[in-house]
């Protein structure tokens, strides 16, 4: 389908378009014209990704000054899906235009997913893979090999060295599988192929961390130009990603490992002093001249990037007391020993970075300035010593990153020292949490650097919370409804059981036997009437375990077994993957299954249950965060004092965005259908419901907001009977989707109404002039 938005020709790779897709593309185009930040909430399953890509690729080709799209998503599966959509779009553009445009689209993920080296790819831990990769690909390793030394290298990486960076791969859209196959065929490293081709790409699709986490962004995204268009897709959790990228946890175990790493560094320094003291002398001279000079090496060799934001890195020489290698090692020893003594606590301590630094100075005489240079100084030392096996240095990296962060940032951070790592632990296992409280710190450089930033998801409501939390002004802020020829999803609020007892996951009520029994009855009854797959979500793993145990003793699970298999999500990703595969198999072969999951878990965030895989979703309770968490309490206090966001408002906003995310799992298109059950009396209150996305709110009828279990079952049965009636594509024509003719008619009407509005406005202006 080809149509115009203003003067921009759009090629859309489907013969039909949803009305909300067209509106979304219009708003996208206007926000790109204006520059700045747009916040757009698009309903689940309405083709958000292809709308974005069609509009922005057309915009790129029409306005060549906007040459690059940086598309950030959260999970591997979403990156793969976006690349597949882009590939389809470019194939369609080629067929319509009659020639192939010079276009390169690439996706980037971690070494763990792209590595081809036989021994490295076997490793399960991402940090170990990164370290092993560096030990084979660092510049000095290659130099040693060329000098005739017998050192292991990676042939996949070595084969890239003789090629020009811009000619590693040909134009086209390369999915992650494509680039891996190409690497196997040509014996070239897929990871470094993509890394080196990023400056030459038209579209880059990768994870948020490549742009928001300074430790990664400084290596990967530093060379991207300011005229890039940045899209954060599935961005409902973007504030949490920002906070995690600047937060660090240290435990006693990590400090012990850091001490071992310091000892091995010391040993290496002594060896180098004996064999080649000029190395250390050269490094010292470079540090005297200035740190940037010392680190002027290939980014691919870098041991670690600076954990602070680029504008917060000090552009000056390293302080004299940590320039010499032996002095720096003594400095690290002293700091780690100090942290170990701080760990010996029996009660919780919370303090600001300023008071922590003052305490460090009082006890150890360590100043703030050298701490601030720790990360860069360690990187320089590891490079000078030419240490290739760095996998044991991960804990030391964390310690120096902590030192650099705590000495750099005074506002928006807190240190919390807890004697127990988990709430229900009995054996002391102290943990030092350095937590970022202000999400705007990490994203601010992105807003300042790039001309256009689009933040979009299916669950951003209430929209006004994000500009407050992330400190930005929008040029466009919109939540779209959903146009349906028939209501293909049924959202309803169940506030009480069949015995009229109110149901809630509130802490005081959650273990009440009548509430547990009523929740169990809801699961049993919906298992009976729902065909194929049913997904249930709970506020936490703790509550899930507790209620499943109670249901087992009440015989409720035995009752559910009669109708469907029962599978449970666990914190272990491998177990959860296995449970999902079994769930899908049971749905496909007609046995049917119930998947018991957790809001904020893997299932709620990245797994789609389209068609028969999810005919109903039940949200048991409201997924509030654990409010006794000290980090959360500190963040709530910060939001209240700094941005005037009340605690209750933030907690409700956070809970409702996760509830909406869970509900959206079962609706993956307008030809799909599903039941959405909100099982908690608190959902009956309008202050909760109004925080749901517009596309869910518009289909919650007044009669479905205060139901008992029996009433909800009657509504669900009626809905499923309706969905079973024949419903063809022609029934949706002109309502839930438009052909090209429908679209042109709509555009004419819009132009006509705009002209009428304009003439009215001019008439009013004339009247004002006459009166004056």
UniProtKB/Swiss-Prot annotation:
CDD domains: SF2_C_XPD (cd18788). InterPro entries: ATP-dep_Helicase_C (IPR006555), DinG/Rad3-like (IPR045028), HBB (IPR010643), Helic_SF1/SF2_ATP-bd_DinG/Rad3 (IPR014013), Helicase-like_DEXD_c2 (IPR006554), P-loop_NTPase (IPR027417), RAD3-like_helicase_DEAD (IPR010614), Rad3/Chl1-like (IPR013020). Residues 7-283 form the Helicase ATP-binding domain. Its main location: nucleus. GO terms for cellular component: cytosol; nucleotide-excision repair factor 3 complex; nucleus; transcription factor TFIIH core complex; transcription factor TFIIH holo complex. Disulfide bonds: none annotated. [4Fe-4S] cluster binds at residues 115, 133, 154, 189. Keywords: 4Fe-4S, ATP-binding, DNA damage, DNA repair, DNA-binding, Helicase, Hydrolase, Iron, Iron-sulfur, Isomerase, Metal-binding, Nucleotide-binding, Nucleus. ATP binds at residues 42-49. ATP-dependent 5'-3' DNA helicase, component of the general transcription and DNA repair factor IIH (TFIIH) core complex, which is involved in general and transcription-coupled nucleotide excision repair (NER) of damaged DNA and, when complexed to TFIIK, in RNA transcription by RNA polymerase II. In NER, TFIIH acts by opening DNA around the lesion to allow the excision of the damaged oligonucleotide and its replacement by a new DNA fragment. The ATP-dependent helicase activity of XPD/rad15 is required for DNA opening. In transcription, TFIIH has an essential role in transcription initiation. NCBIfam families: rad3. Component of the 7-subunit TFIIH core complex composed of XPB/ptr8, XPD/rad15, ssl1, tfb1, tfb2, tfb4 and tfb5, which is active in NER. The core complex associates with the 3-subunit CTD-kinase module TFIIK composed of mcs2/cyclin H, mcs6/cdk7 and pmh1/tfb3 to form the 10-subunit holoenzyme (holo-TFIIH) active in transcription. This is General transcription and DNA repair factor IIH helicase subunit XPD. The lineage of its organism: Eukaryota, Fungi, Dikarya, Ascomycota, Taphrinomycotina.
């Amino acid at each position: 389908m080809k149509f115009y938005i203003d003067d921009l020709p759009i090629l859309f790779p489907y013969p039909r378009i949803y009305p909300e897709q067209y509106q979304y593309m219009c708003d996208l185009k206007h926000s790109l014209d204006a520059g700045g930040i747009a916040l757009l909430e698009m309903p689940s399953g309405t083709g958000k990704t292809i709308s974005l890509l069609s509009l922005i690729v057309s915009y790129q080709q029409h306005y060549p000054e906007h040459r690059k799209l940086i598309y950030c998503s959260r999970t591997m599966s979403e990156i793969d899906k976006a690349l597949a959509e882009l590939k389809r779009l470019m194939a369609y553009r080629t067929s319509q235009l009659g020639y192939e445009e010079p276009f390169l689209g690439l996706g980037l993920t971690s070494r763990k997913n792209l590595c081809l080296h036989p021994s490295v790819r076997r490793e399960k831990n991402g940090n170990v893979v990164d370290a092993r990769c560096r030990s084979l690909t660092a510049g000095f390793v290659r130099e040693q090999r060329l000098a005739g030394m017998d050192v292991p290298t990676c042939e996949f990486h070595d084969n890239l060295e003789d090629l020009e960076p811009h000619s590693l791969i040909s134009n086209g859209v390369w999915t992650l599988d494509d680039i891996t196959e190409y690497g196997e065929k040509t014996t070239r490293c897929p990871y470094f192929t993509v890394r080196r081709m990023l400056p030459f790409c038209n579209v880059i699709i990768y994870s948020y961390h490549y742009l928001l986490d300074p430790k990664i962004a400084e290596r990967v995204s530093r060379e991207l130009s300011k005229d890039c268009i940045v899209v954060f897709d599935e961005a409902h959790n973007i504030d949490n990603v920002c906070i995690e990228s600047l937060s660090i946890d240290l435990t006693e175990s990590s400090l012990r490992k850091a001490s071992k790493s310091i000892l091995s560094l010391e040993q290496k320094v002594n060896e180098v002093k004996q064999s080649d003291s000029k190395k250390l002398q050269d490094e010292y001279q470079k540090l005297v001249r200035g740190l940037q000079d010392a680190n002027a090496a290939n980014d691919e060799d870098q041991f670690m990037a600076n954990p602070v934001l680029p504008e917060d890195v000090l552009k000056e020489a390293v302080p004299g007391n940590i320039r010499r290698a032996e002095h720096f090692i003594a400095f690290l020893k002293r700091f780690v020993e100090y942290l170990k003594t701080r760990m010996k606590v029996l009660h919780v301590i919370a303090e600001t970075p300023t008071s922590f630094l003052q305490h460090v100075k009082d006890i150890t005489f360590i100043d703030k300035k050298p701490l601030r240079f720790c990360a860069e100084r360690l990187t320089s030392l590891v490079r000078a010593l030419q240490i290739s096996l760095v996998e044991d240095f991960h804990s030391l990296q964390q310690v120096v990153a902590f030192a650099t962060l705590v000495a750099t940032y005074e506002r928006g951070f807190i240190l919390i020292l807890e004697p127990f790592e988990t709430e229900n632990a009995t054996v002391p296992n102290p943990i030092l949490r350095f937590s970022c409280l202000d999400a705007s710190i990490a994203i601010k450089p992105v807003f300042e650097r790039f001309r256009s930033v689009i933040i979009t998801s299916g669950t951003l409501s209430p929209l006004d919370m994000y500009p407050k939390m992330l400190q930005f002004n929008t040029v466009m802020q919109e939540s779209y409804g959903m146009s349906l020829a028939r209501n293909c999803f049924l959202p309803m609020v169940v506030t009480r059981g069949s015995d009229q007892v109110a149901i809630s996951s509130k802490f005081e009520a959650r273990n009440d036997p009548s509430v547990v029994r009523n929740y169990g009855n809801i699961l049993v009854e919906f298992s009976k009437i729902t065909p194929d797959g049913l997904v249930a979500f709970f506020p936490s793993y703790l509550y899930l375990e507790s209620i499943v145990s109670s249901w087992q003793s009440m015989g409720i699970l035995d009752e559910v077994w009669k109708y469907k298999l029962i599978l449970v999500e666990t914190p272990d990703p491998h177990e959860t993957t296995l449970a999902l595969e079994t769930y899908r198999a049971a749905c496909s072969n007609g046995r049917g299954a119930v998947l018991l999951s957790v809001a904020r878990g893997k299932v709620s965030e990245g797994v789609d249950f389209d068609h028969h895989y999810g005919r109903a979703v039940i949200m048991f309770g409201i997924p509030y965060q654990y409010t006794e968490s000290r980090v959360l309490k500190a963040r709530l206090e910060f939001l209240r004092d700094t941005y005037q966001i009340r605690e209750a408002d933030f907690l409700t906003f956070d809970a409702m965005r996760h509830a909406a995310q869970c509900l959206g799992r079962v609706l993956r298109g307008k030809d799909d259908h599903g039941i959405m059950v909100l099982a908690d009396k608190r959902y009956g209150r309008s202050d909760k419901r109004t925080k749901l996305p517009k596309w869910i709110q518009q289909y919650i009828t007044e009669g479905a907001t205060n139901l008992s279990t029996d009433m909800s079952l009657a509504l669900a049965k009626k809905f499923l009977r309706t969905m079973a009636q024949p419903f063809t594509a022609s029934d949706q024509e002109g309502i839930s989707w438009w052909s090209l003719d429908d679209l042109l008619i709509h555009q004419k009407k819009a132009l006509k109404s705009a002209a009428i509005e304009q003439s009215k406005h001019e008439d009013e202006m004339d009247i004002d002039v006459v009166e004056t």
